[in-house]
């Protein structure tokens, strides 16, 4: 903790020492104007060739639930492994994906916060409890494989979270809300100029006794509400170095504790992240980044028949580190050339104890651990030819899986099972290419093709787990996943303030990692021959006077290609994967500071497993957000979740069901938003 406080002081000092005023230098009309943004380099000219959608700050901070997950839900096709959000899910199940490329709790989409990958180094899940909506300026979601910086993780797409700066934030902002079950959501954010730069400090605390995820007719005395207690704090400093270079420093700490289904079924996720970034906007533009993450996770599994602990995953420390260097060399002739390299390394270790449900005695002590790394080299060129923009990129990755082991010992120390994984080194080449043509002032045609890559996580390689009574085995021999995809689209703006888009796509993931069912209560992570996903994505935005609407719709036909051990899965839909997904928000802003919005979400039928036996019924929810100014920058806020009381089934294991959030009302005050 002392080191974290020291880092915070350094961050707050950065803007002042990096650009201290020179009192001996007189100001004159030739003094250059220095502007810091806290952002990365601008998007390249061909970025519109790929299927992307931006979520603005106003939409991020006005969701019915107040969570980043719901803001991302505005893009149909975005999904986590389960339908539950970070208030009622096990953190390790919160991997994210796009385009129904699911069936796995690990993230198949790359998630970046200010350019830094934020997935957990061991599990690959996204720590949504550490992400606060009020800290963000925008979110950009790009669907389809990537080949640029950190492209090896962008199998299904890239989600870029951009932190808010002085141009977005008030000098001071705060909010306090409570719901009808006694839950509270409190946050504060301070933004101030320091020298020629600025600093932002923020904190957030969410807590609740939760709701019952277990249906009333399945509850037992040991049944517990989905309690949570989560806090996070961040510090950010931005400062100029000279006239065209800026330094960005970020630190984030968080702790997230949850209880799910039974008393004692407690989980925790915690971490401390730090990064430094140099962005140059001169003739030779560059983006240099280095980051370090320390994370931990714990989880207790309770027997669903005797309601006592059967597994204590007491400690899972992990470390992630990496960096990138991207250079944009001026070449002229309408070209924008990007050259660069990036590196990521993850290492971690699992320590857990298994107990007898009958005696309470330890039956096994288990340890597992290892490391993975990826070194990538990339080049990409955009060529602007009037109304036509062409782009092409190439990426080479050297991936290493090493130091892997799993050992289970009996109480006396004897080895019950031991796996020592061999060190594996691979080189892979991926690419992407696209074109965007402005056929008229209102019509743009675009198309793209790409090949992407994802390295297995340490969790997939080495950690078995139990969701009682189902056991899922690890597999140290897993190969990299590789995606190849194509898409074509049309963007139409028939009138000012009106945007329509339609995209058709065809994606195939070779070697997709899935929990393959071997027996009724036994699964193993295996590389499937493939998952194929074809579909269409529609989007619409319109703003007329005080009214606006934003909507997306996705239909995806995803199926498993199975052979050998997975032959029984051939033609089945991947687990937890819907065909239909839709989202729409209608807003009314009668005057400054007032806002009323309704949000509709729909997710189609899903199946709990790849055998398509346990069905999750379609769910349609309605949410609301209302804000009214009171005095100065103080506003009244009222929110509503699942207003129609829809039954949202998030898990169905042979009739044992978990439910999502019920009808919920929030009310409170906001200042400075």
Predicted regions and their residues:
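Extracytoplasmic beta-strand/coil segments of soluble accessory domains associated
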Residues: 69, 73-116
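Short acidic/polar hinge/loop motifs at secondary-structure boundaries
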Residues: 116-143
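Outer-membrane beta-barrel signature, preferentially recognizing the C-terminal barrel domain
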Residues: 264-282, 312-320, 365-374, 419-434, ...
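Surface-exposed extracellular loop regions of Gram-negative outer-membrane beta-barrel proteins
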Residues: 294-298, 347-358, 400-415, 423, ...
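Signature of Gram-negative outer-membrane beta-barrel scaffolds
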Residues: 336-440, 455
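Gram-negative outer-membrane beta-barrel transporters
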Residues: 384, 390, 498-509, 526-610, ...
């Amino acid at each position: 903790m002392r080191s974290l406080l020291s880092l915070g002081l350094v961050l707050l000092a950065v803007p002042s020492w990096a650009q201290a005023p020179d009192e001996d230098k007189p100001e004159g009309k030739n003094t250059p104007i220095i502007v810091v943004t806290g952002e990365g380099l601008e998007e390249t000219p061909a970025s519109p060739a790929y299927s992307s959608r931006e979520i603005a700050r106003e939409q991020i901070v006005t969701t019915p639930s107040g969570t980043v997950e719901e803001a991302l839900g505005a893009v149909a096709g975005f999904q986590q492994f389960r339908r539950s959000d970070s208030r009622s899910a096990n953190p390790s199940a919160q991997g994210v994906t796009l385009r129904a490329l699911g069936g796995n709790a690990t993230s198949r989409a790359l998630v970046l916060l200010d350019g830094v990958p934020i997935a957990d180094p061991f599990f690959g899940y996204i720590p949504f409890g550490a992400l606060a909506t009020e800290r963000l300026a925008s979110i950009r979601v790009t669907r389809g494989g990537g080949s640029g910086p950190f492209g090896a993780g962008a199998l299904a797409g890239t989600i870029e979270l951009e932190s808010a700066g002085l141009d977005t934030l008030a000098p001071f902002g705060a909010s306090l809300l409570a719901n009808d079950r006694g839950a509270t959501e409190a946050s504060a954010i301070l933004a101030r100029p320091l020298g020629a730069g600025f600093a932002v400090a923020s904190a957030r605390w969410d807590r609740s006794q939760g709701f019952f995820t277990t249906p009333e007719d399945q509850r037992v005395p040991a049944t517990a509400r989905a309690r949570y207690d989560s806090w996070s704090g961040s510090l950010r400093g931005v400062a100029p170095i000279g006239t065209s270079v800026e330094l960005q420093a970020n630190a984030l700490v968080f702790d997230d504790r949850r209880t799910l289904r039974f008393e004692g079924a407690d989980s925790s996720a915690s971490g401390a992240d730090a990064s430094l970034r140099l962005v140059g906007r001169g003739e030779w533009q560059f983006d240099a980044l280095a980051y370090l993450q320390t994370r931990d996770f714990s989880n207790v599994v309770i027997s669903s028949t005797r309601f006592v602990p059967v597994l204590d995953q007491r400690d899972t420390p992990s470390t992630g580190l990496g960096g990138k260097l991207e250079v944009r060399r001026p070449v002229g002739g309408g070209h924008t050339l990007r050259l660069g390299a990036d590196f990521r390394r993850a290492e971690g270790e699992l320590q857990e104890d298994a107990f007898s449900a009958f005696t309470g005695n330890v039956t096994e002590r288990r340890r597992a651990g290892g490391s993975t790394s990826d070194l990538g080299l990339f080049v990409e060129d955009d060529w602007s030819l009037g109304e036509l923009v062409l782009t092409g990129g190439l990426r080479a990755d050297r991936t290493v899986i090493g130091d892997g082991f799993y050992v289970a010992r009996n109480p006396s120390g004897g080895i019950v099972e031991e796996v020592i994984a061999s060190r594996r080194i691979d080189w892979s080449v991926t690419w992407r290419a696209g074109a965007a043509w402005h056929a008229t002032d209102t019509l743009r045609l675009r198309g793209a093709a790409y090949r992407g890559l994802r390295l297995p996580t340490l969790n997939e390689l080495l950690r078995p787990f139990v969701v009682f009574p189902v056991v899922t085995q690890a597999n140290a021999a897993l190969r990299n996943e590789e995606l190849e995809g194509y898409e074509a689209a049309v963007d139409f703006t028939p009138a000012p303030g009106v945007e329509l888009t339609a995209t058709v796509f065809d994606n195939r993931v070779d070697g997709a990692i899935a929990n393959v069912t071997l027996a009724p209560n036994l699964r193993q992570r295996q590389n499937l021959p493939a998952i194929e996903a074809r579909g269409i994505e529609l989007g619409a935005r319109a703003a007329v006077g005080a009214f606006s609407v934003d909507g997306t719709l996705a239909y995806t036909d995803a199926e498993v290609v199975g052979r050998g051990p997975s032959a029984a899965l051939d033609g089945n839909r991947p687990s937890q994967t819907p065909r239909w997904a839709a989202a729409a928000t209608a807003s009314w802003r009668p005057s400054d500071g007032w806002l009323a919005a309704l949000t509709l979400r729909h997710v189609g039928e899903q199946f709990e497993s790849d055998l398509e036996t346990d069905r999750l019924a379609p769910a349609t929810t309605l949410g609301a957000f209302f804000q009214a100014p009171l005095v100065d920058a103080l506003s009244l806020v009222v929110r509503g979740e699942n207003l129609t009381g829809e039954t949202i089934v998030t898990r169905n294991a042979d009739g044992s069901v978990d439910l999502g959030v019920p009808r919920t009302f929030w009310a409170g005050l906001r200042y400075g938003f």
